[in-house]
Design a protein with these regions (language model features):
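FIC/Doc superfamily catalytic core
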Residues: 1-123
Length: 123
């Protein structure tokens, strides 16, 4: 296979983990979302896909794609000037940072991603 080419294993779900991740980011208790903001939901989506490995191959790539897709779907992907909030280099960096992080640092990783999205909003 050529470099950068996906294998036949790419994107194959191992179990129902991906469905569980999607459910977890919109989970609520007592009528309130556990992750109330779009930024928190997007950050957790990236974190859970990268760390929980719901696919046999491609978890980082799928996690990065789903993160950007989720931001786009919820109209949180652009700065006020029309540029993307998260450029390609930042996306690679935060995805690899999450992948290399210790599970005990989950809150730090999620907070970093949330702050990065908010900081790029110009608020």
């Amino acid at each position: 296979m050529d470099q950068k080419e996906a294998t036949v294993l790419f994107g194959n779900p191992k179990d129902d983990g991906f469905i569980g991740i999607l459910g977890s980011i919109v989970q609520s208790f007592g009528g309130a979302y556990l992750y109330p903001s779009i930024e928190e939901q997007a950050a957790h989506l990236l974190y859970f896909i990268v760390k929980n490995h719901p696919f046999t191959d491609g978890n980082k790539r799928i996690g990065a794609f789903m993160f950007i897709w989720f931001l786009q779907r919820n109209k949180h992907h652009l700065k006020k000037n029309g540029e993307p909030k998260i450029n390609d280099n930042a996306l690679v960096a935060i995805t690899l940072l999450v992948a290399q992080s210790e599970p005990s640092h989950k809150k730090v990783m999620v907070d970093l991603i949330v702050n990065l999205i908010k900081e790029q909003s110009g608020f």
